[in-house]
Amino acid sequence: MRKIKSLALLAVAALVIGCSSGSKDVEQASVNELYTKGTTSLQEGSYSEAIRYLKATTERFPGSVYQEQAMLDLIYANYKTQDYTQVLLMVDSFLHQFTQSPNQAYAVYMAGLTNAATGDNFIQDFFGIDRATRETTSMRTAFSNFQNLVRVFPNSPYSQDALARMAYIKDALARHELEIAKFYAKRKAWVAVANRVVGMLKQYPDTKATYEGLFLMQEAYEKMGLTALANDTQKIIDANKDKTFAPIEKPNEPDLKVPAVK
């Protein structure tokens, strides 16, 4: 029993010593040492280790020449570890600290990717049991991020990919709205059905889901005895019956590279 206790104490002591030395490694290192270790870890794919050193670089030496690059590296490293909350915090901090940086486009792009990844479960689980109340805030925020990127930085290397992701998100959100309209139709909530499809026509007019929603809207108007509106809806359906909708695939994960501060 004494031997077991001794071994346990040795293990605890080793752990304490290890933590202490690791802490000193960060607390006492120079800004050059911290940044070098951080970037080396990043290149090796040791993202958690990279975050430890780069975070110390930005927090212990906030005015250093490495600040901008270290923050960009941290955005990337946190994204790779799927710490999405930290990514968004770092993006917000970067945008406020470096208002004139040409790398703002990268930061906004990463915010879009992060919000899209946060909402990815919504996309994957879309056609589950009952998704009528599924939260879509992250996907809508991602769309807004990409939209701002394309508007403010139209010539950035991220704009084309942002456009593709906007198309995918818009299609997914339209399908989500259609599912809600179907949900209401099953419960014969015809006013809610009509209102939902009207909203789809305003927000997602050029999607397949919205065209399919027109049939629900026509049915809703008929059930409510609104013959004129039902006939108008039929005219819209007929006018678009030959329209084709190309399938929109989910964009692949981008080949991300952290931009170099010049």
Curated annotation (Swiss-Prot):
Compartments (UniProt record): Cell outer membrane
Keywords recorded for this protein, A-Z: Cell outer membrane, Lipoprotein, Membrane, Palmitate, Signal
Xref: PROSITE patterns: PROKAR_LIPOPROTEIN (PS51257)
Record-level GO cellular component terms: Bam protein complex
Signal peptide segment: 1-18
InterPro entries: BamD (IPR017689), BamD-like (IPR039565), TPR-like_helical_dom_sf (IPR011990)
Chief place of localization: membrane
Lipidated sites in chain (N-palmitoyl cysteine): 19
BP GO terms, sorted: Gram-negative-bacterium-type cell outer membrane assembly; protein insertion into membrane
Domain of life: Bacteria
Residues where lipid is bound covalently (S-diacylglycerol cysteine): 19
Disulfide bond sites: none
Membrane topology designation: Lipid-anchor
Its biological purpose: Part of the outer membrane protein assembly complex, which is involved in assembly and insertion of beta-barrel proteins into the outer membrane.
Family membership: Belongs to the BamD family.
UniProt subunit comment: Part of the Bam complex.
Name of the protein described by the UniProt record: Outer membrane protein assembly factor BamD
Gene: bamD
